[in-house]
């Protein structure tokens, strides 16, 4: 593909138009005008024909995979090399995907016979997590006579993975990441003794009779006591709801039923908060010595990662979450609980990140949760919209419309409270979260379970 340059425009304006005007008024000069026009057209055709395959010998190499973090500036690098060692002034670009946040769309690269390869990079600040694939890059340079911009397209293979940004939420829960014995650690008092058997030892004065191992005592003919330790390597599963309600923003509604924009950036939703909380909880569970698992569902189970530990497992969970998008369907809790009942045989802590403010969805959840509540410890976390609180709780009322709005918020708050009481009879714990403190409160909930040895 070619496009005329500014020089070509000037050549046409000064080399064709004046002779043509002169030939129109003075017929003897018509031959001169025709000759100038033919020469300019022939030169332009020659210049274009000699640059049809100008990109032959050029190679453009991108990394196969580039990993970036949302809202953190990074580099997208490529290597340009000319095996024919020509002097070229290149302009390089590619089709930018939404959310990549390129600082500059087109880069300029100058190749010379002495420097036939060069490394260039685009500055970018992605603001949306997900997977971006670059399949083609576009090159442009000037022809030999500089009458044309000659362009070409080259196939490339580059995958950009943008992961969630955990920075601000990690700071709010930083105490959970401190190792035992370090200065500044937030100490958590353990309630009760451990329940996991560690070893046998000889009876000592003051040991409880209930800890005596009677079979070993009879065999050795002297009292033997069982020693217990705090439970380790327990299984913790985060269950993420990616159905239609997770696409909402947690900012609440204004009087005109528009979502408040000052609470979160435009691209964030409830699902973004769920993903951030899940990845942070994985790190905390790893520091506590527990095994972390992940389950994603909407109207079916979309992804299941069995509880394990280690860096490779964290990468597997991150790969399962970074491309997750809301699906406009209603969640099927019956299928979800049947899947959990069949796959999770060992007692585990199940932390649900879902939405139950829809009465139909809440009824379906309450109806089927007993399938797993007797075997597992179930914790439900819902992020309530801004303003959902008891009637005339904190928000000021200025006119009649505010009264109706607060009344609607009160009905929604009362519905969640009734659901919380109903689920408590089945041994299920429901916790209402605010958007700003969601990640920190979920981690605190997990630490309390560890402290009280509820699992």
Residue ranges and their predicted role:
Residues 300, 383-388:
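Short beta-alpha junction loops
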Residues 331-384, 452:
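Exposed acidic/Ser/Thr-rich ligand/metal-binding surfaces
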Residues 38-312, 347-352, 367, 371:
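An amphipathic, basic-hydrophobic helix/alpha-beta surface used to engage anionic
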Residues 304-332:
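Short, charged loop segments at secondary-structure junctions
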Residues 315-317, 387-417:
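Acidic, Ser/Thr-rich peripheral helices and adjacent loops at domain boundaries
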Residues 268-270, 324-328, 351, 356-360, ...:
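Short, contiguous acidic/charged loop-to-helix segments that flank catalytic cores in large enzymes
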Residues 394-395, 414-455:
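Long, C-terminal catalytic modules of enzymes
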Residues 1-59:
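Extracellular/lumenal glycan-associated context and N-glycosylation machinery
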């Amino acid at each position: 593909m070619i496009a005329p340059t500014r020089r070509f425009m000037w050549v046409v304006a000064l080399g064709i138009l004046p002779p043509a005007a002169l030939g129109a008024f003075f017929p003897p000069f018509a031959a001169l005008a025709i000759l100038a026009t033919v020469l300019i057209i022939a030169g332009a055709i020659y210049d274009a024909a000699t640059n049809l395959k100008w990109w032959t010998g050029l190679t453009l190499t991108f990394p196969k995979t580039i990993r970036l973090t949302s809202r953190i500036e990074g580099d997208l690098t490529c290597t340009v090399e000319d095996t024919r060692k020509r002097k070229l002034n290149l302009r390089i670009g590619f089709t930018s995907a939404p959310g990549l946040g390129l600082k500059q769309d087109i880069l300029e690269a100058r190749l010379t016979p002495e420097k036939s390869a060069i490394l260039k990079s685009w500055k970018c600040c992605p603001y949306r997590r997900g997977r971006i694939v670059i399949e083609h890059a576009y090159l442009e340079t000037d022809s030999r006579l500089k009458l044309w911009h000659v362009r070409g397209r080259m196939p490339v293979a580059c995958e950009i993975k943008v992961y969630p940004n955990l920075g601000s939420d990690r700071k709010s829960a930083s105490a959970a990441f401190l190792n035992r014995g370090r200065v500044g650690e937030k100490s958590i008092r353990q309630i009760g003794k451990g329940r996991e058997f560690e070893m046998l030892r000889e009876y000592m004065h003051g040991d409880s009779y209930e800890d005596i191992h009677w079979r070993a005592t009879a065999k050795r003919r002297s009292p033997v006591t069982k020693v217990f330790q705090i439970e380790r390597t327990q299984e913790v599963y985060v269950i993420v709801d990616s159905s239609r309600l997770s696409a909402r923003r947690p900012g609440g509604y204004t009087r005109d039923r528009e979502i408040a924009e000052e609470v979160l950036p435009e691209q964030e939703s409830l699902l973004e908060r769920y993903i951030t909380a899940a990845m942070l909880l994985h790190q905390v569970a790893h520091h506590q010595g527990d095994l972390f698992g992940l389950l994603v569902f909407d109207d079916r189970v979309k992804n299941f990662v069995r509880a394990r530990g280690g860096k490779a497992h964290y990468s597997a969970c991150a790969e399962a979450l970074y491309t997750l998008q809301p699906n406009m369907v209603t969640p099927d809790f019956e299928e979800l609980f049947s899947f959990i009942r069949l796959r999770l045989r060992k007692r585990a802590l199940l932390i649900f990140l879902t939405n139950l403010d829809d009465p139909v969805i809440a009824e379906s959840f309450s109806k089927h949760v007993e399938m797993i509540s007797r075997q597992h410890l179930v914790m439900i976390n819902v992020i309530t919209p801004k303003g959902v609180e008891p009637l005339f709780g904190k928000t000021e009322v200025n006119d009649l419309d505010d009264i109706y709005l607060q009344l609607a918020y009160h009905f929604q708050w009362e519905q969640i409270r009734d659901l919380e009481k109903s689920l408590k009879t089945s041994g299920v714990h429901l916790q209402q979260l605010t958007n700003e403190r969601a990640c920190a409160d979920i981690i605190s909930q997990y630490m309390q379970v560890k402290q009280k040895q509820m699992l």
